[in-house]
From Swiss-Prot:
Keyword Phosphoprotein: no
Reactions performed catalytically: [GlcNAc-(1->4)-Mur2Ac(oyl-L-Ala-gamma-D-Glu-L-Lys-D-Ala-D-Ala)](n)-di-trans,octa-cis-undecaprenyl diphosphate + beta-D-GlcNAc-(1->4)-Mur2Ac(oyl-L-Ala-gamma-D-Glu-L-Lys-D-Ala-D-Ala)-di-trans,octa-cis-undecaprenyl diphosphate = [GlcNAc-(1->4)-Mur2Ac(oyl-L-Ala-gamma-D-Glu-L-Lys-D-Ala-D-Ala)](n+1)-di-trans,octa-cis-undecaprenyl diphosphate + di-trans,octa-cis-undecaprenyl diphosphate + H(+)
A biological process term (GO) from this entry: peptidoglycan biosynthetic process
EC number: 2.4.99.28
The name this protein goes by in its record: Monofunctional glycosyltransferase
Lineage: Bacteria, Bacillati, Bacillota, Bacilli, Bacillales
PANTHER family, alphabetized: BINDING PROTEIN TRANSPEPTIDASE, PUTATIVE-RELATED, PENICILLIN-BINDING PROTEIN 1B
Bilayer topology annotation: Single-pass membrane protein
Length: 270
């Protein structure tokens, strides 16, 4: 063999290498497939953005509507004949309502994120407005939106409650609440309810009537959940259990001592 032929043989392209190279390139072709995921994310974003815009518009409208509520009008509650400021009540009387209705009352600024989220979720799933409102929200609902039952009311309620918290201190808000809620038998203030049901007063500065007791405070705080159903003179098991629960919460949250709790439970007869 000629030297030149040997040179050509040694430098001849290797077919096996070409096939390996071809196989190598084919193996890496799937690398481009993740582009489908990007398309999927794009579709989700296209659907999500309009939804967020609609939600934003609804919230904006509800905020504008909430501005119609004049928070100065809440002061009208203080003009009731039997109005008593919360600062003039026993701590356990105030505690009976806070423990049962809004244990984080002194910590939040009008609404409790956990409670409100739970209430809105229940409203959406059950198609009915559920509880979970703070005392401030209940003040707003009772004064401005008493007959309105809807999700939009909940949203307006949040905005107004935040304004109320900025304009009034906690003592004033609690006073508005306890003096503008239905206790049954045509009683709408805690003082008139205490007079009517027990012949006592909630005003610690009033020397003309006996002071409301721990148990009586818990009974009134429990009754507002179903004022037309719960009968103080003939307490059902549900009503009794609710009062007991309130007393337990009052003790746990430091509004009453162990001895006060035990005495109240003994009076309750459970």
């Amino acid at each position: 063999m000629k030297r030149s032929d040997r040179y050509k043989t040694y430098n001849k392209p290797n077919d096996s290498n070409d096939s390996n190279q071809l196989h190598h390139n084919t193996y890496f072709k799937p690398v481009n497939k993740p582009q489908k995921k990007k398309k999927g994310k794009g579709i989700i974003l296209k659907l999500l953005i309009p939804i967020l815009i609609i939600i934003g518009i609804i919230i904006g409208v509800m905020y504008a509507l909430s501005l119609r509520a004049d928070t100065d009008e809440l002061k009208n509650i203080t003009e009731k004949e039997s109005f008593v400021y919360a600062s003039d009540m026993r701590d356990y009387t105030k505690g009976a309502f806070i423990a049962m209705e809004d244990e984080r009352f002194y910590k939040h600024h009008g609404f409790d994120v956990k409670g409100t989220s739970r209430a809105l979720f229940s409203t959406l799933s059950d198609k009915s407005v559920q509880g979970g409102s703070t005392i401030t929200q209940q003040v707003v609902k009772n004064y401005y939106y008493d007959n309105e039952q809807s999700i939009t009311r909940k949203i307006k309620e949040l905005f107004v409650a935040h304004r109320v918290e900025k304009e009034y201190d906690k003592n004033e808000i609690l006073s508005f609440y306890m003096n503008n809620i239905y206790y049954g038998s045509d009683q709408y203030t805690i003082e008139s309810a205490a007079n009517h049901y027990f012949g006592v007063t909630t005003d610690k500065n009033n020397p003309n009537l006996p002071q409301i007791s721990v148990l009586q405070s818990a009974i009134l705080a429990s009754k507002i959940n179903a004022p037309s159903v719960y009968n103080i003179n003939d307490m059902s098991d549900n009503f009794t259990n609710r009062v007991k629960t309130d007393l337990e919460k009052m003790k746990q949250q430091g509004y009453i001592s162990n001895s006060q709790y035990e005495n109240a439970i003994q009076e309750l007869g459970v």
